[in-house]
């Protein structure tokens, strides 16, 4: 007998829901059944973010730093890229603050990738489409073409390793706790960043110390993003195939809480076993090397 020669088996959201209902001893019949299954599946994905690192959700981000002058530099950046589409960006200056004429919202310019776009820091306030923007140091003006989306930034779960690149050479940065960053006496010191603080708000940010001393250094880091939502039933899940059994088992357990309480115990046990097996496989196969670090040691 010949083998199939294919290795592309997958389940769309509708098939995942059908399998989960069948494990509960039920059948998916109505539109509400499909809707409640998708809702439970999205809650399951949120729970996975709380269980630890899912390697397929790790993304590499490269961000250029921004400095306006020897006394003004951007130290806090979005974890990802916020792009502002405008009528013209040429006359604005990297590092300066822009203000919305109607909303009074503010943000700092990080880069100007094209003649009609700027990347900015997390806005303070909400910019309004078509309003006039004014630069604080250049006095340049332009019009905001469309509303700004923060969805990519808000999908960040956490940040992993961070480095700063200068002249092709990378240096690893050390992470500060909220208390350690607060204890820094002079947060306005400029230099090559050596440390960073991640503020895990709904719109998370990363703050560097010392503040960047130029607009050419690059910050390179890995961020952990959210698993994409289970929206349309024809979509497939944002997971590797190894997690298909785990996803189905987890959804079956979540549905049993609502529809088949007599099966909660056994379905929960199956789910926990499937998740542990998948999570154990979802790791990096590297040699263990322990290196002591004294960069953040403080003697009191």
PLM feature spans:
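Autoprocessing Asn-cyclization modules and mimics
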Residues: 52-148
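Glycine-enriched, solvent-exposed interface loops adjoining structured elements
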Residues: 1-81, 143-300
